[in-house]
């Protein structure tokens, strides 16, 4: 027998393998799983074993010699002429010390540093990008940190520099910020250049401040709400497009968070993303633990949202909050139309 392609899968309760030839997932016992792990690695089925699978049409020899992306042949063209977005990490510094931050020291990777980007480096990156996006329909420049607004002067220089060199192409500016450094000058700048803005806010004061604190240990909720009020007063139309990112940790009270975003007049349905603490590489696993209460609250709200989409119940503030959770699915799957064919009972040839 030639080479076969399978993928072994283990869950807390059972063991399986995925068979490419029949596009099937098959449950197996412990002994079979160990043999299949070897098959997965060697791509060869030992003689005289796993006969019941072979008889069922599984573990067939594959005719595939190589798998590649449909755009593989165009990669060079895309990279050299259609580069879509430039992300500048303008600093690795941050004025907050959030417990679940990827750079907090609670993950097995780098922690916050004093590294910052200088303007010469930024110019080289922008020049590199402009040279390789000449055939793109529009440009996109994003600023990332740390906390990017610690380098507000650099960001202003970068925006000015790319605007002078972009030609007649449209450009989108994007930034994710913790919302604590939004002075009047910053607000005026963001509105002027129509930044796509995402602000981190973990719901009500108690839920937010337990994780998102300044270096001194003081919570950041109050100053963020003050800045949001100032931004909304400055330009309400711009503010209506601002997005918010809410991270749920084991210490969060999801019921209070939903209530806060539903009732606080600063927020509209559809502007809040809800995420859980990333458990990958996390040293303190308790931070990412989902409590039973939070699980029940989220599932109930999600079911309400689905029923509202299906027009089985009226929309309420909470179900509107979760409407964004369907957007990823809607972006992936376009509506498909099906044609039903009625075949004759007897086919004459």
Predicted regions and their residues:
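Accessory C-terminal segments flanking Radical SAM cores
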Residues: 3-4, 8-12, 16-33, 320-341
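N-terminal [4Fe-4S]-dependent radical SAM core
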Residues: 3-18, 22, 26-27, 47-87, ...
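Short helix-coil junctions and helix-kink-helix linkers
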Residues: 37-44
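Conserved alpha-helical substructure of the radical SAM core
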Residues: 72-188, 192-193
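Conserved radical SAM core fold
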Residues: 107-108, 148-150, 179-184, 196-218, ...
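Structural preference for beta-strand elements that scaffold enzyme active sites
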Residues: 138-142, 172-174, 196-198, 241-243, ...
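Radical SAM enzyme [4Fe-4S]-AdoMet core and its adjacent flexible, acidic
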Residues: 206, 211-225, 229-341
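Single conserved hydrophobic/aromatic residue that forms the stacking wall/gate
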Residues: 340-349
